[in-house]
Every structure is written in structure tokens, then in C-alpha cells.
């Protein structure tokens, strides 16, 4: 397996774990919509995304957004926005 395949394989493992967390959390929220803030906070998925020399004001949820989009592209999660808040839930067959 080359480096690209290994990295993409690991991203798929991360996406699966994120999906499982969303599924486990759904019962605690109305209509199963899990707030993205809950997901990012519980899994500590906010990171600083710029080099140390650059300036950024705090951690951002870019990594979570990428992985959540991977799940959305595979039709494994649904996304909903209410006001400024984002929510996710698993797609049920």
C-alpha cells in the first residue's frame, strides 16, 4: 500500500468512528439531530490549522468538517443548519 492509500484508509477509519459516535449520541437529542458543537467538543476535534509562525485566533473545526463531509458524500449522515448552528444525524435505511 502506498502512502496515499494508507492516509485515505486512516481517514475512512476516522470517518467510521465519527459516524458511530453520532449514532450513539442521537438518542440524547430531539429528532436525533446531534449538534456539531457537541461532537467537536466531546471528541476534541478542534485544531489550529496554520503554521506556528502565522496568526490564527483559536482552534477551528476544519478537520471535523472534512470528515463529516466524507460521510455526507457517502450518504451516511444528514446535515441541517438552524440559524448559526449545525446538526448531523445518521441516515437510516
Please describe what each predicted stretch is.
Residues 72-81:
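A short, conserved structural fragment
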Residues 65-69:
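Short, hydrophobic-biased segments on the C-terminal half of alpha helices
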Residues 1-8, 51:
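Short, Lys/Arg-enriched N-terminal segment that forms or immediately precedes the first helix
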Residues 5-33:
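Positively charged, polyanion-binding regions of nucleic-acid-associated proteins
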Residues 28-33, 44-64:
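Short, positively charged loop/turn segments that connect secondary-structure elements
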Residues 38-40:
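A short acidic, leucine-rich amphipathic alpha-helix
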Residues 81-93:
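Short, cationic-aromatic polyanion-contact patches
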Amino acid at each position: 500500500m502506498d502512502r496515499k492509500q494508507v492516509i485515505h484508509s486512516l481517514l475512512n477509519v476516522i470517518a467510521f468512528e465519527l459516524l458511530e459516535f453520532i449514532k450513539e449520541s442521537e438518542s440524547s437529542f430531539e429528532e436525533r439531530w446531534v449538534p456539531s458543537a457537541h461532537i467537536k467538543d466531546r471528541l476534541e476535534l478542534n485544531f489550529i490549522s496554520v503554521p506556528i509562525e502565522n496568526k490564527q485566533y483559536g482552534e477551528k473545526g476544519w478537520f471535523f468538517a472534512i470528515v463529516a463531509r466524507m460521510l455526507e458524500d457517502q450518504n451516511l449522515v444528514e446535515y441541517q443548519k438552524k440559524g448559526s448552528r449545525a446538526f448531523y444525524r445518521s441516515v437510516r435505511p
